[in-house]
Amino acid sequence: MSIRRLPETLVNRIAAGEVVERPAAALKELVENAIDAGATRIAVRIAEGGIARLEVEDDGCGMTAADMVLALERHATSKLPDDAIEAVTTLGFRGEALPSIASVARLTLESRTAGGDGWRRVVDNGAVVAEGPAALGQGTRVIVEHLFARVPARRKFLRSARSEYAACLDVVRRLAMARPDVGFTLEHDGRRVLDVQGGQDRVGRVAALTSRDLAANSIGVDLDRGEVHLGGVISLPTYNRGIADHQYLFVNGRPVKDRLLVGALRGAYADLLARDRHPVVALFLDVPTGEVDVNVHPAKTEVRFRDPQLIRGMIVGGLRRALDEHGFRSVQKPAEAALAAWQQEPVAPPPATGFLFDRRAGAAVHPFAAEVSLPAADVARVYDRLMPFTAPAPLAGRAEVAATPPPAAEAHPLGIARGQIAKTYIVAEAEDGLVIVDQHAAHERLVLETLKRGMAGQAVPSQGLLIPEVVELDEPACDRLEAAADGLAALGVELERFGPGAVMVRATPAMLGAIDCHRLVTDIADDLAGYDAALGLNERLELVAATMACHGSVRAGRTLSVAEMNALLRQMEVTPHSGQCNHGRPTWVKLAMGDVERLFGRK
């Protein structure tokens, strides 16, 4: 077949396949157009997840009738001067969105400029079917109906209305977060699901669009490096989710899903969260336009940086410092949830197993009183011998000051240990409430921070094995261990290659005590294999250190003395990140004294 030009309608449908893959993609393009038009208020209405209908209305600058004709042609835009492709400042610039959408749906475009007349133009799957005057205020209204109705090959790949709605909601939420100066509303099937006012600051907009708990469990980020600025909020490691759906990343006000940024985020939380847990973040990166390329993909969700290592280092280092400064904090949500779930239950009196004596009546009461009887005087004498605590003992002598008074809880943030529950949890009394500590999680963090100091140059003491242990593994695992041998030596693990499918372990960290050497090395090999290239070797070694810390920590089920419990509390108070274990779970929670008093009806 000879080479020929493709028909314009087919070209538009091919372009639509890149730009408009689902209703959420079409919605993103329309809302971005509204933002670029200078809108201060954007209203979005969708039906059946956007499959049946999408409507975006704004109060931006609007278009004339002549501009509306050009807007529906490919590669026609007002946003890109001839020489500005390297310095794009608008969200859209390709001039492909409207014609691409109009080629696979019925699109109604209505617009009016300040002081001009409203105009309406209707395009059905690439063909203009109607146009004429329209009644509306300044701004633009775009209605998209029956998306992919005439492209069954694309429509059958759409998901359920609920899934498509969730994707549309995510698009609006991200764009609303990027522009706190603009008001947004979203209605789905006639029900308003989102409404935020313009003029908010970034932190206020993020809180309004995410969880109310985030404000109390987050850290502010504000960092400058030359002309690059990084701002936003990040959650405490203990405030995390099972999926990464609450990670909002923006570059120059543009929502992106970039592998470099996601990898940097994982690196910052590397030894603070388990692999299957994810922080809640909203990060805004402002970079000179010449240092970033947004013209990578038609959907404009990917970017390329001129100096990616600078950006990655800034994110990892900046977030690490912010987390270090708040390492003692623990999430407050568990304590509040526990308090809400704590319900008062009536306490039934224990069944009577002995004598009940009413001194006022001078008689004994017992279930078998009809069969057994004693003189009242004898009953009273037996009762007093069995229950000596019913009356206070007479005072004798004089009061003496204790030689070693109990320590005051006010002297320490985590209080003074008062006991242990289930050989797992330390109960401490603080100045302003009750503190409960997970002994294994807390000690795990303390061991990890010691190992990390070893990686930073303060060598971790090791203990040589009397008989070196050979651990058999597959060859790729041995290769990874051999490559990381120097880093592992700083952590106190000394090993060397022992043939193609084994390594010989000569020493382990002294602080871990007697451990299962085979299991430790196997877990280290799995950790080195389990993290992709988005993390550097040092970051992966920190994750290895987290695994080692778990092997050598105080286990749940071990009875601790009061001195051991207090020593653990004091060490926690001076250790970075002691508020969470290596898997992102809290190491301690606090029940404020006011909450305790409310439980007993005192407040």
Curated annotation (Swiss-Prot):
Q: What keywords were assigned to this record? A: DNA damage, DNA repair
Q: What is this protein called?
A: DNA mismatch repair protein MutL
Q: Which family does it belong to?
A: Belongs to the DNA mismatch repair MutL/HexB family.
* Cystine connections: none
Gene Ontology biological process: mismatch repair
**UniProt-listed HAMAP family:** DNA_mis_repair (MF_00149)
The protein's role, per its UniProt record: This protein is involved in the repair of mismatches in DNA. It is required for dam-dependent methyl-directed DNA mismatch repair. May act as a 'molecular matchmaker', a protein that promotes the formation of a stable complex between two or more DNA-binding proteins in an ATP-dependent manner without itself being part of a final effector complex.
Species annotation? Sphingopyxis alaskensis (strain DSM 13593 / LMG 18877 / RB2256) (Sphingomonas alaskensis)
Instruction: Give the lineage.
Output: Bacteria, Pseudomonadati, Pseudomonadota, Alphaproteobacteria, Sphingomonadales
Q: Which Pfam families match?
A: DNA_mis_repair, HATPase_c_3, MutL_C
Alphabetized GO MF terms: ATP binding; ATP hydrolysis activity; ATP-dependent DNA damage sensor activity; mismatched DNA binding
Classification via PROSITE patterns: DNA_MISMATCH_REPAIR_1
Q: How is this protein annotated for GO cellular component?
A: mismatch repair complex
Question: Which gene holds the coding sequence for this protein?
Answer: mutL
